[in-house]
Amino acid sequence: AIMNAMGSDYIREVNVVKSARVGYSKMLLGVYAYFIEHKQRNTLIWLPTDGDAENFMKTHVEPTIRDIPSLLALAPWYGKKHRDNTLTMKRFTNGRGFWCLGGKAAKNYREKSVDVAGYDELAAFDEDIEQEGSPTFLGDKRIEGSVWPKSIRGSTPKVRGTCQIERAASESPLFMRFH
């Protein structure tokens, strides 16, 4: 049900309040692979820091491309030094891009026009990015021109009352609980 919501064109915003180690990052990557290969959408994911984003690209994204034949077929650059294969961006032969950026700098929320914006470990992001706004406020601006805009946020909650994923979920019109 969670991945169905993430992949549905009829649901614009998905907030996943989760416990630790439930596989949210893997679900997010699976849905992103679907968006890139099947729905041909540009995607972007933010992690709390540039280091987190770089590590995520190396340890999660690159093995995902390697292990999914339909994605690997769109990545002739895989395993090679190439302008379409960097630590912040992967450009596929279908013209679609995948960006993975840190969430601390306001510049990382500019210039990209994507269809899907994702946030992994939203509770670990700064509440205000360089006095320009919250990560979701800045990031969701990137999907405003999309025909099928999608914002997917997920995190294990931190301090009650100050947690961004808790706030995002409380602002949602619907709340589903899975036991």
What role is predicted for each listed range?
Residues 1-179:
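Phosphate/NTP-binding elements of NTP-utilizing enzymes
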